[in-house]
Curated annotation (Swiss-Prot):
This is Probable Xaa-Pro aminopeptidase MAC_04092. Transmembrane segments: none annotated. Belongs to the peptidase M24B family. It comes from Metarhizium acridum (strain CQMa 102). Mn(2+) 2 binds at D273, D284, E478.
């Protein structure tokens, strides 16, 4: 991979030109038709109409200022169109995908600029036809007027199409099948989508590198956030996939910390979780940096445990692997590490049976990445905690309680239970993109609020020794991993390990 590094004096940000062979994908048409056909395959029908409205232009409440636009991801998936007030229809029987775009009056151009024309949309997106939304109602009325109109598939009842002219809808609507079908289609990425996530990771990795180069000169968490945004914007990405997390000291123990306004002085570490979007596709990267340029003994010990957790878990990624098993391996390594430090104590078997390590590693190992940073998981969850009615869903960050972890461990070791769980648990497939993000956290409120008074766990924790680790805060390391035919590829190129320490201490070139 080659980089061209350019200083942009206007905002003192690193401009990154990443040259890869796969970047040509971003210059081709968005594969809308491919994605629509994937959806129909999962839908399992040979006739009908898929109707998806895009995000309308909406003003802030009691204001004439617009809300920050974010395209509806299901609509985007089968069109690639990233502007307001559009819609999409796909006629299943005729394999015809139509993008409906708004007509922009000249006076609107004066105030707000133009939007892509119908001809431009045809060049950008692999759709069969581009028409104006002013014609959509008449199209739908003709569809409804058929002697036996096919079913119209919509995501939600409140997205039923408007036939206009006060007509009562004669459409046969189904809002139960499309969403799960689209989730199953989205969970395995097309090559185009992989290229988009790769590009987002390249830019975000450059942002993390730039923070590492400057970290010894920074004084406040907000400076970290500013650098990340500047680097991403300078490289063409104006949108972060999620709010930037820059938690120093005890703030690093808050999983979704967002204030980003605390001074860095006197802290051991800072957890930086940040990833931008490229063409609506997300990245998700976390690095933990020593603020002095070297690890304190306590932070070094925790970082070593988390680093091993991530390295070994990434090595286990491959087609046919159950995510539950990788998560359990991470939890086992975390438990062994904390037992070695004396933070956890007691017989290994007893600690494992209780699941007490979840007090320190309280979230799932990872999630899908795509059009959402916590992307859809299809129909099956990554892991299922039997008896809890709660799933460790790839698409949403979920709390992993000790009892859930204990149930997962028991099901994995019991042949009968494992068979049931295997049918409930998602196996990794080629072209899935997942994060591997183990972490160990010392959140005083969480630990003392739930575990100190719980006899099932209190005796397995050395509370006096734990006091010496609260100032570490937390350590998390996260990369985006592409599942390949024969294993995996790490899409994240942000420095970590010894390379990260070298970057920190060498500073800016």
């Amino acid at each position: 991979m080659d980089y061209d590094l350019v200083m942009e004096d206007e905002f003192d940000a690193l401009c990154l030109d990443v040259r890869r062979d796969h970047d040509s994908a971003s210059k081709t048409k968005y594969p809308a038709k491919l994605h629509a056909r994937k959806v129909v395959k999962e839908l399992g029908v040979d006739d009908g109409l898929i109707y998806l409205p895009g995000q309308p232009d909406i003003s802030l409440e009691n204001s004439d200022q617009p809300r920050l636009f974010r395209q509806r991801r299901y609509f985007f998936y089968i069109t690639g169109a990233d502007f307001e007030d559009c819609a999409a229809t796909y006629e299943v029987k005729h394999d015809k995908l139509t993008l409906w775009v708004p007509y922009v009056e000249p006076r609107q151009v004066l105030w707000f600029g133009s939007k892509p024309s119908a001809a431009e949309c045809k060049r950008r997106y692999d759709v069969d036809e581009v028409r104006y939304t002013t014609q959509l109602s008449s199209f739908l009325r003709r569809f409804a007027a058929q002697p036996e109109p096919p079913v119209v598939y919509i995501l939600h009842p409140d997205q039923a199409p408007d036939l206009g002219h006060g007509s009562q809808s004669q459409l046969r609507l189904d809002s139960s099948l499309l969403l799960p079908a689209m989730d199953r289609a989205r969970v395995v990425k097309s090559d185009y989508e992989v290229a988009m996530v790769r590009r987002a990771n390249d830019i975000s990795s450059a942002a993390h590198r730039r923070v590492a180069e400057r970290i010894l000169r920074l004084t406040n968490e907000r400076e970290i956030e500013a650098i990340i945004q500047a680097v991403c914007i300078a490289n063409g990405s104006r949108s972060q996939a999620y709010p930037i997390i820059a938690g120093s000291g005890a703030n690093g123990a808050t999983l979704h910390y967002g204030a980003n306004n605390a001074p860095l002085g006197g802290k051991q570490c800072v957890v930086i979780d940040a990833g931008c979007e490229w063409n609506c596709y997300a990245s998700d990267i976390t690095r933990t940096l020593p603020l002095s340029g070297s690890w304190t003994p306590k932070a070094a010990a925790i970082h070593a445990i988390v680093q091993r957790m991530q390295q070994e878990c990434i090595a286990k990624v491959g087609p046919g692997t159950a995510w539950r098993d990788i998560h359990l391996h991470a939890a086992s390594l975390g438990m062994e590490g904390l037992l070695g430090l004396g933070i956890l104590k007691g017989r290994r078997e007893d600690v494992a049976r209780a699941g007490t390590v979840a007090a320190f590693f309280p979230h799932g190992l990872g999630h899908h990445v795509g059009l959402e940073v916590h992307d859809v998981s299809g129909t099956l969850a990554l892991s299922a905690a039997e008896g809890h009615g709660t799933q460790l869903d790839f698409g949403k960050r979920a709390m992993v309680t000790p009892s859930m972890l204990a149930d997962m461990t028991r099901s994995a070791s019991s042949p009968d239970a494992a068979g049931v769980q295997e049918r409930k648990t998602q196996l990794l497939l080629p072209n899935m993109i997942v994060t591997v993000e183990p972490g160990i956290y010392f959140c005083r409120e969480y630990l003392e609020g739930y575990f100190r008074s719980d006899p099932a766990h209190a005796d397995f924790i050395d509370w006096d020794l734990l006091e010496e680790y609260y100032d570490v805060g937390g350590v998390r390391i996260e990369d985006c991993i592409l599942v390949t035919e024969d294993g995996y590829e790490n899409l994240t190129v942000a420095p970590k390990g010894d390379e990260l320490l070298d970057v920190i201490n060498k500073g800016e070139k």
